[in-house]
């Protein structure tokens, strides 16, 4: 496999006529030029049993050559406090206090709080080295003085830490005290922790001005350049209530601080209260408040976890908006990324007449290429076709740069086979700091990834990408639908789930019928509202997918390119820690739609039931398929005919992830069950949501819940909803040169739904 030499991203998922979208590119070297051109994406599957990969080159103003350059990415989350006047670098005595909960105390050097220039060894820093807290000052000539704790830190234990510089005594002091309660730490009160200490060391130098910002959860690499301090030696874990004093605190002061008491308020230079700003809408901001009154406010970089339990959390309240004083922590990770913050390479203003569709900028450098996908909307407030395709951009973000098959312990067991590797997978493994993680990954300290960003290269959001289990997934899989619509001459517009979140049902009401892609798993509450209102008001929907509307997510109100998810028990790669199930971005509870009384069955008719990734089955017709009220759906399909017994995804139309009809979960009672899938292997199993007690007989050969159901129901006001309930359905549309009953059934429904008449009533 060859190395990838170039990659890029754009600033947002979608853009309308007359609007401008920006593109950012980084090559492995600052040398030569790269080529860029606009392409329309049509079919992303190179499976030889299908029509093959398709794209259309589009002449545009962006086409041309651009200087190739390497652009550095700042990886890892931290807080930055600009300090141009050196107010946080006292000339005389000073002290630093904070509460600390380290998740990787033995993982090398980690800056906890610092105003430090690592290049010149100037300033001060409170850090972890070799598992112990260290307080250091440096004079800028290479000379430093340090005091080191004589007790190592325990993992996930809250401590009160105080570092003191006392020039009068020419001394550095360090006070370390565990502040464990019944719920805030890994261990409880019964464990006799030997971790408290008070130590001192000679201070033979004076701290010189570092000429950097103050950083929480990292160290400054060098003096600030263009107003920017690069952060290195990232800290993993939580920090709560950091403070700086312009005096030398004593042991009595440190003891009071460990109890949360106020000491020497006149000498307090800064006090960053991470809970300040929590309100009824959560804490949807990167702003960090200095509660001292001195105006040293800061900003979160790369989205540390907000709404996190603090040093004094007692377990009685689980929602941070109800008890902000116990949620004063930020949880930092060395592998967070919310925006690469590269410099712009070029931009594109959408001209009038450019068709609404799936697009990408194709970039080429040396012998490698990359695609930067985006979606062109019709002119704002208009529809240019009767059909709307919703691109699953929230789910694209959830899976962005996932490494499930290659790194998850159970990845191969879930798939039923060994993973398929390609260049993008190897690149993610080698150069993770370019790309960041998905919400299916864990941070280096084991915490599940709950924030994901569009503003970074997303290597599996590429039209030719094949997922680790060997088939295509998300965007490339959704191109099966785009290709089929083009092949059959249907006129359509495209919008994204981000647009739906912004515009609601008003967006959908412009269209006679709205189509999903193959896997709209992640949705906002507002998106569910939009779908439900649209259908109830007479809209028509085609759910050509499975595992849709499963996880509730939120879009960051200040950074709409960032999405947040908080997961609970279910089909999940991780579960949020106790007390942290509520979104920082709005304070609402996260988890599954089903867990908030809104199972997918209530809107689309079917909901998640099973999954497996070895092969796909086919559908057999149920008695309702012969009901004369749905003859229009079954037209041209014989009563005994198998539906979807061939396809590009797993070899059939019923596979990978499956949804079922279930009246108990809210399937409308007038729903007709037209067909159910069969021939699923033991790799397919009932999802945890339906397992009150694990027991034998839960797999595809044994349990009735392992199936996908094709359903139809009518709604009030002439609406209708058709569901195929399988991720692999779209992969069968082009099977046998588009001459198959999956294509026929889908076309029957779509032709009916675009008519100027109500959907057939059942």
UniProtKB/Swiss-Prot annotation:
Annotated membrane-spanning segments are: none
Checking Pfam families in the record gives:
DMFA2_C (PF20254)
**GO MF entries:** N,N-dimethylformamidase activity
Q: What is its EC number?
A: 3.5.1.56
Reaction(s) catalysed by this chain's protein: N,N-dimethylformamide + H2O = dimethylamine + formate
Q: Which domain of life is it from?
A: Bacteria
Alphabetized Gene3D superfamilies for the sequence: 2.60.120.200
Job description of the protein = Hydrolyzes N,N-dimethylformamide, and to a lesser extent N,N-dimethylacetamide and N,N-diethylacetamide. Has no activity against the substituted amides N-methylformamide, N-ethylformamide, N-ethylformamide and N-methylacetamide or the unsubstituted amides formamide, nicotinamide, acetoamide, benzamide, acetamide and acrylamide.
Name-wise, this protein is N,N-dimethylformamidase beta subunit
Tell me what organism the protein belongs to.
Answer: Alcaligenes sp
Query: Which gene underlies this protein?
Result: dmfA2
């Amino acid at each position: 496999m060859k190395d990838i030499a170039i990659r890029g991203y754009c600033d947002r998922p979608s853009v309308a006529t007359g609007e401008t979208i920006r593109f950012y590119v980084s090559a492995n070297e600052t040398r030569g030029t790269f080529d860029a051109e606009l392409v329309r994406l049509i079919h992303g599957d190179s499976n030889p049993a299908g029509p093959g990969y398709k794209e259309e080159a589009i002449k545009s103003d962006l086409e041309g050559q651009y200087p190739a350059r390497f652009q550095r990415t700042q990886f890892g989350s931290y807080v930055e406090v600009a300090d141009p006047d050196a107010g946080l670098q006292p000339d005389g005595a000073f002290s630093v206090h904070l509460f600390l909960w380290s998740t990787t105390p033995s993982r090398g050097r980690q800056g906890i709080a610092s105003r430090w220039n690592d290049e010149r060894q100037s300033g001060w820093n409170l850090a972890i080295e070799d598992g112990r807290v260290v307080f250091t000052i440096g004079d800028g000539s290479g000379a430093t003085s340090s005091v080191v704790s004589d007790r190592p830190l325990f993992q996930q234990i809250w401590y009160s830490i105080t570092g003191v510089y006392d020039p009068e005594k020419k001394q550095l002091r360090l006070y370390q005290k565990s502040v464990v309660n019944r719920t805030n730490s890994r261990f409880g009160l019964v464990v006799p922790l030997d971790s408290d200490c008070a130590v001192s060391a000679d201070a033979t130098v004076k701290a010189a001005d570092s000429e950097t910002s103050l950083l929480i959860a990292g160290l400054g690499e060098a003096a600030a350049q263009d107003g920017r301090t690069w952060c290195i030696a990232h800290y993993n874990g939580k920090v709560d209530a950091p403070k700086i004093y312009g005096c030398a605190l004593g042991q009595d002061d440190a003891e009071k601080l460990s109890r949360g008491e106020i000491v020497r308020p006149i000498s307090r230079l800064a006090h960053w209260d991470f809970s300040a700003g929590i309100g009824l809408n959560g804490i949807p901001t990167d702003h960090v408040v200095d509660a001292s009154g001195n105006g040293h406010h800061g900003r979160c970089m790369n989205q540390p976890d907000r709404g996190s339990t603090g040093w004094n959390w007692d377990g009685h309240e689980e929602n941070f908006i109800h008890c902000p004083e116990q949620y004063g922590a930020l949880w930092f990770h060395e592998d967070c990324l919310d925006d690469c913050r590269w410099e712009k390479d070029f931009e594109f203003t959408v001209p009038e007449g450019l068709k609404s569709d799936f697009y990408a900028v194709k970039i080429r450098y040396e012998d490698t290429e990359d695609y930067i996908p985006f979606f062109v909307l019709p002119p704002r407030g208009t529809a240019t076709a009767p059909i709307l395709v919703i691109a699953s951009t929230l789910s694209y973000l959830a899976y962005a740069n996932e490494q499930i098959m290659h790194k998850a312990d159970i990845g191969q067991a879930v798939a039923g086979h060994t993973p398929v590797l390609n260049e993008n997978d190897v690149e993610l493994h080698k150069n993770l700091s370019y790309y960041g993680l998905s919400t299916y990954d864990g941070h280096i300290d084991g915490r599940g990834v709950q924030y994901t960003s569009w503003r970074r290269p997303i290597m599996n959001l590429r039209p030719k990408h094949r997922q680790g289990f060997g088939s295509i997934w998300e965007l490339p899989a959704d191109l099966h639908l785009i290709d089929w619509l083009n092949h059959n001459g249907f006129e359509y517009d495209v919008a994204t789930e981000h647009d739906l979140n912004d515009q609601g049902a008003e967006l959908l009401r412009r269209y006679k019928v709205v189509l999903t892609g193959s896997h709209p798993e992640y949705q906002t509450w507002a998106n569910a509202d939009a779908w439900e209102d649209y259908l109830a008001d007479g809209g028509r929907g085609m759910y050509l997918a499975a595992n849709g509307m499963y996880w509730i997510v939120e879009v960051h109100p200040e950074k709409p390119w960032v999405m947040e998810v908080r997961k609970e028990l279910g089909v999940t790669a991780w579960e949020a820690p106790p007390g942290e199930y509520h979104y920082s971005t709005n304070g609402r509870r996260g988890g599954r739609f089903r867990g908030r009384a809104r199972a997918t069955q209530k809107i689309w008719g079917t909901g998640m039931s099973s999954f497996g990734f070895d092969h796909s089955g086919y559908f057999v017709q149920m008695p309702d398929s012969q009901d004369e009220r749905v003859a229009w759906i079954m037209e041209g399909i014989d009563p005994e005919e198998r539906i979807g017994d061939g396809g590009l995804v797993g070899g059939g139309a019923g596979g990978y992830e499956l949804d079922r009809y279930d009246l108990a979960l809210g399937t409308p009672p007038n729903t007709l069950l037209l067909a159910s899938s069969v021939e699923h292997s033991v790799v397919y199993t009932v999802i945890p949501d339906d397992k009150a007690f694990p027991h034998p007989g839960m797999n595809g050969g044994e349990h009735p819940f392992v199936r996908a159901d094709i359903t139809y129901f009518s709604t009030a006001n002439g609406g209708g909803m058709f569901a195929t309930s399988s991720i692999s359905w779209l992969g069968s549309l082009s099977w046998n040169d588009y001459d198959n009953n999956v294509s026929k059934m889908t076309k029957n429904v779509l032709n009916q739904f675009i008519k100027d008449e109500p959907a057939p009533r059942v």
